[in-house]
Amino acid sequence: MARKENRDRDREERDSEFVDKLVHINRVAKVVKGGRRFGFAALVVVGDQKGRVGFGHGKAREVPEAIRKATEAAKRAMIRVPLREGRTLHHDVDGRHGAGRVVLRAAPPGTGIIAGGPMRAVFETLGVQDVVAKSLGSSNPYNMVRATFDALKNEQSPRMVAARRGKKVSEIVGRRSDAAAEAGLE
């Protein structure tokens, strides 16, 4: 009995570190002989505001149950995204899903989250404070969230790039100032 209580307490502590945002609820109807039967689908984004984020989809006959299922699915599907200075992206990225396309751009301090609807929920739960994002094509919340995640999966820190190329981080990051200096001289 004590083991089960410890497991429940550990689960509650782990869950308390996450922030979840409800992005969309969809009501669907099944027509039966006696009338309509309603069901609900929920899209939830969950994150720790420190670089981990996930999204989930849940369906049920009642809204709270659909949200609970979506939250559980989101916690199981979390990804880690490297953040620059813990507040923005390292570089600009594009993402696609279906007809939805998103463009995410790193922003200077004080910019805030400039993003529409479902993308804003992703950035708030991720812990991004400064970003500029544009959604093109589909405005379907599912496609927008999936396209945003596609873009975030392509995000790479200078450390990751340096490891892949077999170089030092200073060689990767140092090029920004070298390139700017060369451009200014010529």
Swiss-Prot record:
Matching HAMAP family: Ribosomal_uS5_B
Origin species: Parvibaculum lavamentivorans (strain DS-1 / DSM 13023 / NCIMB 13966)
Cellular component terms per the entry's GO annotation: small ribosomal subunit
The protein, known as: Small ribosomal subunit protein uS5
Function: With S4 and S12 plays an important role in translational accuracy.
Self-association state and partner proteins as the record states: Part of the 30S ribosomal subunit. Contacts proteins S4 and S8.
Description of its domains: The N-terminal domain interacts with the head of the 30S subunit; the C-terminal domain interacts with the body and contacts protein S4. The interaction surface between S4 and S5 is involved in control of translational fidelity.
Domain of life the protein comes from: Bacteria
Family classification: Belongs to the universal ribosomal protein uS5 family.
